[in-house]
Amino acid sequence: TQDRYSLCFALGKALEDQHEYVESFECYRRGNALKRSELRYDPAKSRQQMLDMASICTRSFFAQRSAWGCPKPDPIFIVGMPRSGSTLLEQILASHSRVDGTLELPDIPRLANLYRARQGTSRPGYPANLPLLERAQLRELGEMYLEETRIHRRGAPFFIDKLPNNFREIGFIHMILPNARIIDARRGAMACCFGNFKHLFAAGQEFSYDLREVGEFYGLYRDLMDHWDHVLPGKVLHIQYESVVADLESNVRRILE
């Protein structure tokens, strides 16, 4: 099955390059259907997880924990949907002498999972356990993140952590690293969703193999980003991919500022 859907995606790209769009779409459709049949992705679970995060991470929740966590401003998180221009933003930032580019770092999800494991099965799971984190724990988690990511740095005062799915973890990031910068790489719904549908990911992104499901996930992403803007006003810088392509110079200035 893997060989079949890999071939479908490759043929879809080759036909698209030849402007054979009907045939190309049919190859993508078949490849996605084969890949989706192997997965256990549950759209309802994704929706509930994001609703749970939003219900816990309120303005008052963050106000009660103001200036908790590790105060260092070193990380610049690039988040958003896959295929939304995050790599371009990373390249722009990494061209600055004060910023180190890195990899797609798994440390934020891993730390969240580590905390969940510490609590054991008798306690609520993540994110319901976020209110249980005490001030000293948040600082420890922030310092742990900086220590574990140090291996990827080359001496610049700032570094990039580009893991698009971290848009779901902005609340956790703010709790442990309140002075970290966060950039949302955003792209129009049609281009972003179809870009996901055409791409065979090496791992993860299980929402992307069905057009309805990727559209629903994009809506969840936008809703959660709107929530972060409401409860953490000014925390996230939103950069539209189409705007960067149309006017690179002014957007580069905006990003670097």
Predicted ranges, named:
Residues 1-152:
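Alpha-helical solenoid repeat scaffolds of the TPR/TPR-like class and their adjacent stem/linker regions
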Residues 102, 106-134, 150-257:
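PAPS-dependent sulfotransferase catalytic domain
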